[in-house]
Amino acid sequence: MNIESIIPSGNGGINGEGRTLKNICEKPVPEHLIKKLDEERLAPEVVSRMKADLARMGSSRVPEPAQNGHVDFSAIAWPGVSARLPEKDGLIAAIRQNYPGISLDDITPRSIRDITYYIGRKALADKYGITIAKAGHIIGLLDLVIHETDDSRIEIVPNNVHRFKQLYAHKGYVSKMLKLINGKEVADEDE
């Protein structure tokens, strides 16, 4: 089967529209979701900039299936929204700000994602001059998700592709950091 014609499904109800991978990658955020930005309490110029950037989002190239836990979603990421993630010591310090007294053994994927998702929302907020809470809302509104790359960056990518584990189960930053911090492993980034 041609990868482009696969219709992602399952995994928490992704892709209710029944779009093919090729269609999702060419237009990651469908027009009916982009129109929802008009209903948000945002300055018109912010909505206009977001729509212009979302119009540039996407690629005719469908990401290759995960290989050895690695995926490359960069071609379908929100243009211009990226941030570096902290190295091990910086991550531990940030987690301990959220969870004072936490032992290294008690650090989990969730406590790591609390930091990475904040960084991702902040990157979007900074780009458009909106609040971090509003940035998080918009990511969900547009059916996108924060993806941590295995080279320690965040990207905002289509949920329909990111959660399509049959092709894209991956281990990235969260898995790498968890193993460095306490030796634990996760089977997939979303666990």
Regions found by a protein language model. Give the residues of each.
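Nuclease and nuclease-like effector domains acting on nucleic acids or nucleotide cofactors
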Residues: 2-145, 149-191
